[in-house]
Amino acid sequence: MSPFTFRNSERGAVSVLTVGVFLILTLFVGMSTDFGIFLRYRRAMQNACDSGGLAGGLNLRTDPMTAAPTAERYAENDMRQNAIAWNALEATTLDENNQPTLIAPRRVRVEIHAGVPTYFLRLVQASVPVAVDCMARLTPIILGRGLEPLGLNYNAWDEYANTQGCLPLIQDGTPLAERTPPCDSFSITMSVSASGNPWGSGNTGMLAMQAPGATGDCFDDCPVGARQWMDTFIQGSPQSYCYDAARSPAVSDYTLNGQSCANVRTRPGTVTGPVINAVDARCDSGNPLDRIVVLALLNPAYTAEGGGSYTTEIWGFAAYELDCDNRPRPGAGTVTINGGFVSFVSMQAVGETTSFDTGVYTIKLIE
């Protein structure tokens, strides 16, 4: 072989090798790029699915007919914000056995199907089908210490959570220290009054709940003294209360095991000493969870009028974090508890789940 022929063969081999390496690198870059796009789409779709499931799950208890439409609406909004088109998006309400139902559903399932476009691999396939699904479950929880014998006017909660726009921060579990006013605090106020005065002066009043160590249910009437009230605040009521799902304007018969569990008795009058001592005990316990107290949100038709002791309905529950750096002190006829509302999920879901209906729920993603 002549030197000239050898050199030509060598140059040809180098050219083939260079082209081969270039094609391999191009294919690798293309696959990496398309795989990154695929992961981005799938993560965004999963987030949209989870968002829809949690949003729909919030309605399973109070308005089950709207659970699936709400889940779809929230999932669709997330998909649009991420500029992702979907081929199919559907939510279904299920019972405990994962069978579709609209009667007392316990779960909501969301499925999303979409085609993820390819770029470098478009010559092979224009898009890749991707499917995600998720399921949120309505789960009763065991409270850390039970409900506190304090009732809050539901309208005061609604003003704070909805009118002032604080509900998303509460649902997300955003710490109070990371919030901006007015969502970073909510003062509970009680007028120091005699038992004959109107109940609930301020936005809150004392409730007569079953005290620790007591036996027997007392949904309609639990007469307690100041010391019993303080012990109940410190330890939580051992009785399980629920809430009036229909939010009826009059005393309801919404029951738990045959008892009117949504009914609670007011305790007229406010005594400053037990309030201060009870908050001090919760703050000084050494357990951060003891700073979280669960309040009953009461039918505003009764918290706005009436005197003495009477029966009213619980319309809901809210977890409240005590501000232990700013504890209650006696004032001019008023005692104030400082703190703010926090999420059940982040702070109050302690203990094991139970099939016993406590009326207090959290929404959990289980798939």
Label every model-predicted segment.
Residues 1-3, 11, 34, 81, ...:
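Low-complexity, intrinsically disordered short peptide segments enriched in small/polar/basic residues
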Residues 2-73, 295:
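Alpha-helical assembly-interface signal, strongest on the long, hydrophobic N-terminal helix that forms
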Residues 4-5, 24-27, 34, 99, ...:
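Generic structural signal for short, flexible, solvent-exposed coil/loop and linker residues
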Residues 65-72, 90-107, 120-122, 126-367:
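N-linked glycosylation sequons
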Residues 76-89:
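Short secondary-structure junctions
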